[in-house]
């Protein structure tokens, strides 16, 4: 069970690093490589991503003995294909901010956490992580990092991966579930919407969004 939860976390982190970072930066057409270190799932992690024409074309997280990469919409774990990311933006309003490290996951916002203060619509996206194997076959760490890569936020999604696997384990016929269906709504704070944003996510195990797994609300800061 512990091994399973770890892999799910990894997949989510990978999906996260690519998409929001690319859409939030207004860059020149020159290719740019960004590297930094952070802590993910309690381990020191080295993060690298490449930007070309304002889009992330490659991302890699090295944490301990595991190397998770995103090439296009494919996530690889130690060189083996782990998942495919499918994104369906519902709405999007581009924000121009200065490139720096990238989006950093926060439990709180500098300007507070009152929902009514987040008045600037940023994006609404269906982002699905189609895993190669049953969701329950992955470790917490691996799933956590995959979520990070999919959502383009540097941070720890260990609690989310744990909740996902815990809830899915109680569902009947859970061996059939291979895809995580995420519905993500991002809103910017009224004071500085391009730098401080609230992310609300709901997670399902079916494409019709009928079988609810869990939800998560966090904040991201550009830094």
Predicted regions mapped to residue ranges:
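Positively charged n-region of N-terminal signal peptides that target proteins for export
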Residues: 1-4
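Sec-dependent signal peptide cleavage junction
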Residues: 6, 15-36
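N-terminal targeting signals for Sec/Tat export/insertion, comprising classic cleavable signal peptides
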Residues: 34-63
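Non-catalytic propeptide/linker segments at domain boundaries
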Residues: 68-71, 75-102
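Core beta-strand residues in small-molecule sensory/regulatory alpha/beta domains
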Residues: 76, 196-209
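Short hydrophobic alpha-helical membrane-entry/anchor segments
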Residues: 150-158
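Short, low-complexity, Pro/Ser/Thr/Gly-rich segments in the mature regions of secreted, periplasmic
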Residues: 208-223
């Amino acid at each position: 069970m512990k091994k399973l939860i770890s892999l799910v976390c990894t997949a989510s982190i990978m999906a996260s690093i690519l998409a929001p970072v690319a859409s939030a930066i207004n860059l020149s057409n020159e290719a740019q490589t960004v590297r930094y270190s952070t802590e993910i799932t309690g381990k020191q992690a080295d993060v690298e991503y490449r930007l070309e024409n304002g889009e992330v074309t490659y991302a890699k997280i090295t944490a301990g003995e595991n190397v998770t990469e995103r090439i296009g919409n494919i996530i690889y774990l130690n060189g083996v294909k782990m998942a495919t990311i499918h994104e369906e933006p519902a709405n999007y309003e581009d924000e121009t901010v200065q490139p720096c490290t990238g989006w950093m996951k926060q439990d709180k916002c500098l300007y507070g956490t009152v929902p009514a203060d987040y008045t600037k619509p940023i994006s609404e996206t269906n982002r699905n992580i189609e895993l190669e194997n049953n969701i329950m076959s992955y470790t917490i760490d691996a799933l956590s990092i995959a979520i990070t890569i999919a959502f383009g936020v540097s941070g720890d999604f260990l609690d989310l991966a744990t909740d996902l696997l815990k809830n899915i384990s109680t569902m009947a016929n859970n061996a059939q579930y291979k895809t995580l269906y995420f519905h993500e709504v991002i809103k910017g704070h009224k004071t500085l919407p391009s730098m401080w944003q609230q992310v609300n996510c709901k997670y399902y195990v079916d494409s019709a969004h009928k079988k609810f797994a869990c939800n998560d609300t966090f904040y991201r800061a550009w830094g």
